[in-house]
Amino acid sequence: MSDKFQDRTMAFAGICQAAYLVQKVARDGSCDEAALRESLSSILVTNPSQPLEVFNNTHLAIRDGYRALVEQLGADGSQKNAELTRYVVSLIALERKLAKRKDILNMLGERISQIGRQQQHFDLLDEQILANMASIYSDLISPIGPRIQVAGTPLFLQQPLVQHKVRALLLAGIRACVLWRQLGGSRTQIIFARKKMVELAKRY
């Protein structure tokens, strides 16, 4: 199994983790803090020396994503989650549109750099940082369309902090999609190499 295939599977697990956490936060109002931190940290890694660096140089950072990948692409149909699949497919479609917009990509880089500087003074999960990440998604990415409709518990979805986390996680999902595309990821790979992807994901 090639290193490039492993890297692509890792990037796809990153997309799955962001989608899984979006669903978790939207439904329950919260999610595992360590997984949230790992996914959001990836947004700030804009010039990695190797693909794994995007996920803090450890596959453990996206363990929830690997598990979601196995459930979504594995043979056991009872484990599949249609809503999570919709989020993953929507993120991939949105990133494909983003890739064609150099103007937005430049602004995206500038805004992410600003958050990198702010992080010297605030924790990554501070509400101000979350709000700034959320606004990047709302201002630059969501308007490209198609808009991703997030379902969940109305009581939680009305809360500003939950809204910030959901949008910040969608931004993390876009980051993972960028990496996946850069590594040669494609929809045909998901269809024809799903068994290999599941076998690899089960190792983590």
Curated annotation (Swiss-Prot):
Pfam families: DUF489
Cellular localisation: Cytoplasm; Cell inner membrane
A GO CC term attached to the entry: cytoplasm
Membrane topology summary: Peripheral membrane protein
Keyword Transmembrane: no
Keywords: Cell inner membrane, Cell membrane, Cytoplasm, Membrane
Stored InterPro entries: HflD, HflD-like_sf
Gene3D superfamilies: HflD-like
NCBIfam families reported in the protein's UniProt record: PRK00218.1-2, PRK00218.1-4
The family this protein is said to belong to: Belongs to the HflD family.
HAMAP family associated with the record: HflD_protein (MF_00695)
Name the UniProt record assigns to this protein: High frequency lysogenization protein HflD homolog
